Curated annotation (Swiss-Prot):
SUPFAM superfamilies: L domain-like. Residues 1-39 form the signal peptide. It comes from Oplophorus gracilirostris (Luminous shrimp). InterPro entries: LRR_dom_sf, Wnt_signaling_inhibitor. This is Oplophorus-luciferin 2-monooxygenase non-catalytic subunit.
Length: 359
């Protein structure tokens, strides 16, 4: 009986240990299963999208690069296929000489938060609805260094998250019919746009930055850049401006780096009092034809500025600059040491000479 009892006890112990081990293994197995996400992002099969490529980035987001597509038809064919998911983060196409037109079928049902199509020198037309599948997701659209002459600006009001629109270095002519409640950054430099209508920004209530460097602008009407309550950065360099009227520009910055105005490389001779207001960051007027720095115009501006750049202007440096020479804290805000028309440097002028000559 004793032997049987010991045998039974041993049997019970073994069974219990097996059950405990199995249960523990089951628990461990369950925990491991929980570590496997049920909705893991998967790129389309490489053979289905070639020569496009797809990669999954941090945060389970997919980026698509279609720089090597060989035709408009091939791009549309790739995006006509069924993907595991149509939700992408970025579409990138660069240095492609085969794409000429993007149509409503080019990107199929795929959606993106950013689209960057750059240096595609044969791309001339973006047709209506080309990006419409991304109307609810697109935040940044960059179409840089192509040859675009046609773009559906009038559709941008339907893009409910669009913050950044850039079509720099293209062939856009005339001011676009653009309306958006979300757009904060509009970058159009190096397009032959011409003069900007005085009411151009009334349909862009949240615009913060506008860049139209080298846009064939010859005139800015009073009020053009004063009705945008959030405008902080304005670039109008390398145009044909010869003057600015009173009330032309008013920026709305909130610190020394938030409101900047660049109007370099124009033909501006003078600035009337009240032509520019609200600049707290950097004001650049290099390579113009400014001759005078009268106190009534420039003291209010300089007192609020972080930095003032006015290199390569034919400054007369006569009695009109005495107030500036006598204000070292304002003189220090001037970038570098501009040369006067007579050859002397502005910051090297002798205050004693001006006091004797001008008082």
């Amino acid at each position: 009986m004793a032997v049987n009892f010991k045998f039974s006890l041993l049997t019970i112990t073994i069974v219990v240990n097996i059950l405990v081990y199995c249960n523990a293994s089951a628990i461990k197995f369950d925990v491991d299963l929980e570590k496997v996400p049920s909705n893991a992002v998967a790129c389309p099969a490489a053979e289905d999208i070639a020569p496009c490529t797809c990669k999954v980035g941090e945060g389970d987001v997919m980026d698509m690069d279609c720089s090597k597509v060989t035709s408009d038809a091939e791009l549309a064919s790739i995006f006509s296929k069924t993907f595991p998911s149509n939700t992408f983060r970025e579409l990138f196409i660069e240095f492609n000489r085969e794409i000429t037109t993007l149509t409503a079928d080019s990107l199929g049902a795929a959606t993106f938060t950013k689209i960057a199509i750059t240096s595609c020198t044969q791309l001339k037309t973006i047709e209506e609805n080309a990006f419409m599948a991304s109307a609810a997701t697109l935040e940044k659209l960059v179409l840089l260094k192509n040859d675009l002459s046609s773009f559906p600006f009038e559709e941008m009001s339907q893009y409910t998250k669009l913050n950044w629109l850039e079509l720099s270095v293209n062939s856009i002519t005339g001011w676009p019919a653009l309306s958006s409640d979300t757009l904060a950054n509009l970058i159009l430099f190096r397009n032959p746009i011409g003069n900007i209508p005085v009411d151009a920004f009334q349909t862009l209530p949240n615009i913060e930055q506008f860049n139209c460097f080298d846009c064939s602008i010859t005139e800015v009407e009073a009020g053009t850049f004063t009705r945008s309550p959030k405008l902080q950065k304005l670039v109008l360099g390398y145009n044909g401006l010869t003057s600015l009227p009173v009330g032309a520009i008013k920026l709305h910055g909130h610190g020394p780096t938030t409101s900047n105005l660049g109007i370099t490389n124009n033909q501006i001779i003078s600035f009337p009092e009240g032509a520019v207001e609200g600049i707290q960051g950097i004001l650049g007027i290099d390579f113009n034809r400014v001759t005078s720095l009268s106190e009534e115009v420039w003291r209010p501006i300089l007192e609020n500025l972080f930095q003032f750049s006015l290199l390569n202007n034919p400054l007369a440096c006569v009695c009109d600059v005495m107030w500036l020479i006598d204000s070292p804290e304002l003189l220090a805000k001037i970038k570098g040491n501009p040369r006067c028309a007579g050859g002397k440097r502005l910051k090297n002028l002798d205050p004693a000479v001006f006091h004797a000559m001008c008082q």
